[in-house]
């Protein structure tokens, strides 16, 4: 097929981030300069974000057989780019105290962003696999970036081995689907699945194996065992990327697959996904109750958040509101996670050994960093789904979609899970206002609010509050991205 200027405009974010990767690579080869490479990375990601406006003017189109650029792709590309930008911003002060190679961090984040953008635009199982590998491989290096620390290295090895196993399941599942349907394109799969083929054992086995592979990447129960260890072992800025960009991109492509190929029409698939969602919500929240490490706590809570999103995915066949629910929920989850991990990153910067991730490190934070404590409180309330925050709007949408699709047992799980979640989120919030210990351990810089990371954290808190009270701009944006059939 011929590539026209229109196609090139549609691919602008991908091309800009790809070009930034090359420029940063050459810059590192030419001369090591931490500030220069960080600046180049941030400029590239900002340019890719701005280019989405031009992509919107070009309209929806199939750029290649592997990729479709439309409102849906633009929304998820934007969320991935925002998460990558925040990761680079949080990483800069952290890397200032890091004695080994600093510049490669940005290179790995950019390559992973490239994978996220590819996933957001994927319209074919080959693009799905390429995107997942492109996002996973840099993460192996990023998770083990503080490799002189035993915990970081252990987390990296764990994630690498388990990720390789999950990828093999995913690939084998795709092979079985291809063997039965003779197609890998989402659209063609949808057509071939239309005539009662979903009862074929080979096809069900293929989708089952794909659910195993994707369930690992999304850290859904029972494929979640790596999550708390990796979140705790990885540097705080990397945990930010892992919790946001990686999950959002992969969930976006799963959403598109389910939209084109009506896999959810199969009762067997719906039951399996329902059990996974139920287990993820209940188990994720129960395990978070006993955590005293804030990164482990956020790791377990991310399992339950993906469980809530799975409820909307199961309800996808019952109306377009599901897509809207997922878009709003993911935006709320992104800003809340950026704020929470941003506070941990600020407290842990510059690099001086292990991160400030113990709950004890945050005890009495309000008495010497009141604004930072207020930001953390807002993020915890949003993740818990308290009214007047963006997290509540997302959770309300998920409940509405569940009720609309008559998924009563999953609606009950969401309500019970939210009640359990309220306890441990408030436990973190309350500890910020207790009496500070005599000898505080780690602390954020005095003028943290004037640093780039501090500004990102404050903007996240502001968006969570403003969009929680007045969500219409976000809902309108998500509705624009919804019609893609």
UniProtKB/Swiss-Prot annotation:
Instruction: Kindly state a single biological-process term from the GO annotations of this entry.
Output: ATP synthesis coupled electron transport
Q: Output the Gene Ontology cellular-component terms.
A: plasma membrane
InterPro entries assigned: NADH-Q_OxRdtase_suN/2, ND/Mrp_TM
EC code(s) of this entry: 7.1.1.-
**Keyword entries, A-Z:** Cell inner membrane, Cell membrane, Membrane, NAD, Quinone, Translocase, Transmembrane, Transmembrane helix, Transport, Ubiquinone
Chain segments annotated as transmembrane: 8-28, 35-55, 71-91, 105-125, 127-147, 159-179, 203-223, 235-255, 271-291, 297-317, 326-346, 373-393, 408-430, 455-475
Pfam families in UniProt: Proton_antipo_M (PF00361)
The subcellular location is: Cell inner membrane
Spell out the reaction equation it catalyses: a quinone + NADH + 5 H(+)(in) = a quinol + NAD(+) + 4 H(+)(out)
GO terms, molecular function: NADH dehydrogenase (ubiquinone) activity; NADH:ubiquinone reductase (non-electrogenic) activity; quinone binding
The record gives the membrane topology as: Multi-pass membrane protein
Q: Which family does it belong to?
A: Belongs to the complex I subunit 2 family.
Its annotated function is as follows:
NDH-1 shuttles electrons from NADH, via FMN and iron-sulfur (Fe-S) centers, to quinones in the respiratory chain. The immediate electron acceptor for the enzyme in this species is believed to be ubiquinone. Couples the redox reaction to proton translocation (for every two electrons transferred, four hydrogen ions are translocated across the cytoplasmic membrane), and thus conserves the redox energy in a proton gradient.
Tell me, how does this one assemble?
NDH-1 is composed of 13 different subunits. Subunits NuoA, H, J, K, L, M, N constitute the membrane sector of the complex.
The name under which this protein is listed is: NADH-quinone oxidoreductase subunit N
